[in-house]
Each structure stands twice: as C-alpha cells, then as structure tokens.
C-alpha cells in the first residue's frame, strides 16, 4: 500500500519517482533503522510518556534527515555508483536527476529539519549542527578510511542525545550508553550491508569495515552486537528499566543469532537480508521499553 501510494505520485508528476528513488523513501528500511533507536531515547527521556510535540518533531525529523542523507550519499558516490551492481541504476547515475537538483533537494530537506529543531530549545539546536556535520561528511569517508560505518553510526545515533535535551532540557551521562550501543549496532548491521558490495568495492578501491574485517567479518559483527546489548543492559540499569525491557533485548539477541547463522556462506542476498532483519531487533527493543513503562 505504501509503495503503491508513492508510485501514484508518478502519475501526477513524471519526475516524481526519480526523486522518490533518490531520497529512498520507497525503501523505508533506513527510516526504521534510524527511527527505532531515536524512539528508544524519546521514550526513556519522557519516562514512558514523552510529549506529543517531541514525538512529532523526532519522527518527522528522522524521515527528513534520512532522505537528506540518501541524497548527499548519492551525490558523493555519483562517480563510483556506476561501477557497483547494486547502485548502477540510481537516478544520479542514469541522468534522471542532475547534481544541482540533488544539492538543492538536500538543502531543502536539511532546512525543513532545522525548522523542526527550532521548536525545541537552545541546547538541542546547537546539538543539531553536530548531527548535520556527521550526516554530510559520512558519504565521503569511504574514500579515506576503512571505518565509514563508524561515522554512520555516530550520525545515526545523534538524535538520541538530542531527544533527551529536547524532552527534558538535560543530557544525563547514561544517555551516552544508549548512544554507544546504537553506534556499535549500526557498525554491525552496516557491515552486513557493505558485505553485499565488497567484491565491487575491492575492484574500485572503496573502503569499508567489510573490506577491513575480511574473513573475520561475521564474528566481529556478532561481537559488536553483543557489546551493544551490553551497553543497553547498563543503560537499562541506570534508567531503572525492568523485565519487559530485558525481554526486548533477548528478542534482539535472537535476531542477531539468526543473522549470524544465515550469513554463514556470505552470499550477497543473505547478507542483505541480515541487514534488513536488524529492523526487527530495533523494534523489539523499542516495544520492550514501551511495555516496561506501560505496566508500571
């Protein structure tokens, strides 16, 4: 239904689908992976009852900034995407969208996101500049370092401290445990994603943790996921979360175990499915948090 609604826009404007593909709103997995951890922080900051204003700002902000991130990523990769099987038909490569149009769209999306942040407070506004810097520089990191996934993790986690300052005006030390947990988790699942393109990346000299880790990739991913769960357990203790939260963590651990097993042959499709599967881990943790506060 969601995809059909988006495709119906193409009948209104012949170029609409090109921009939908550029922003990847036709592929909501990235929205989910950014949304769930942001909502972890929103719910914990609000002690189970966050303000509707905060929820609205961060849900819409996730949608806008994920779209902006996809646009700037494709702009940064416009000279290499044509050499990668998975990305060779993207709008900037096919010429359906120009570089100037992509940059203009990026500016509009960032501007709309900043308007949302203006409805919070000074601390959150200042923090938003850090998030923008991370989102803008991430796509270029794969040219210079084998750790672009770490920069992505930092960017994807930046909404968490912002959620605390927006909801409470304060940033407790334990909030950084959530930040570190999500950073570790993001590096793990995005390494699965990078494993899909590893053969192409090796040919064209693109760097990633998948290239760096080599045959140790799956073990390192599982270790990162385990460390993320450990940080979440520590955060749960600091925020006095109860049994439902830990059941959510157990469900997430089950997701991670399935991903490890299913990628044992390192087939492209299996690695991509493992990446997609992380959405369920994030959702399980969020539902655990919501349930924990609901039963009090």
UniProtKB/Swiss-Prot annotation:
Record-annotated disulphide pairs: none
InterPro entries: HB_polyprenyltransferase-like, Prenyltransferase, UbiA_prenyltransferase, UbiA_sf
Subcellular localization, as worded in the UniProt entry: Cell inner membrane
Cofactor: Mg(2+)
GO molecular-function term, one example from the UniProt record: 4-hydroxybenzoate polyprenyltransferase activity
Membrane topology label: Multi-pass membrane protein
Pfam families found in the cross-reference section: UbiA
Record-level GO BP terms: ubiquinone biosynthetic process
Transmembrane segments: 28-48, 52-72, 102-122, 146-166, 169-189, 219-239, 241-261, 275-295
One cellular component (GO) term of this entry: plasma membrane
Predominant subcellular localization, coarse grouping: membrane
Pathway membership, UniProt: Cofactor biosynthesis; ubiquinone biosynthesis
Known catalytic reactions: all-trans-octaprenyl diphosphate + 4-hydroxybenzoate = 4-hydroxy-3-(all-trans-octaprenyl)benzoate + diphosphate
UniProt EC number: 2.5.1.39
Alphabetic keyword roster: Cell inner membrane, Cell membrane, Magnesium, Membrane, Transferase, Transmembrane, Transmembrane helix, Ubiquinone biosynthesis
Enzyme class per UniProt: transferase
Chain's role: Catalyzes the prenylation of para-hydroxybenzoate (PHB) with an all-trans polyprenyl group. Mediates the second step in the final reaction sequence of ubiquinone-8 (UQ-8) biosynthesis, which is the condensation of the polyisoprenoid side chain with PHB, generating the first membrane-bound Q intermediate 3-octaprenyl-4-hydroxybenzoate.
Family membership: Belongs to the UbiA prenyltransferase family.
Protein's UniProt name: 4-hydroxybenzoate octaprenyltransferase
Native source organism of the sequence: Pseudomonas savastanoi pv. phaseolicola (strain 1448A / Race 6)
